[in-house]
Amino acid sequence: DRDYFRIVSSAAVREHDKHHILKYLDPDVEFKDVTEDYACLGVFGPKSRSLMTDMAGKYFANEDFPFGTSKNIKILNITVWAQRLSYVGELGWELYIPIENAKIIYEKIIQDGKKYQI
């Protein structure tokens, strides 16, 4: 959707960033802070692509999901916003999950990750 985007920033500077955005926001643009609506879980490491493929039922190849991109995926029929990035120097994804589904997705990561010693 070209009329929609997300800004992800550190929890430590959430209020600072929010204030800065609102200060310069065009009056025709709606700002909605959804921080409390989502949990973020990270899946990182050399086996992360295999685990993500198992959980989402798709192959997460470089050409299909390049570094620095994001897309909505389904895990257990739950829409999860996945971002391919890494702050740890390994292949990986951040998963933004509706807070009410965070526990079930976490349990899925742990269960399916056993196969990969995660």
Q: Where on the chain are the PLM-derived regions?
A:
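Basic, glycine/lysine-rich polyanion-binding surfaces/domains
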Residues: 1-118
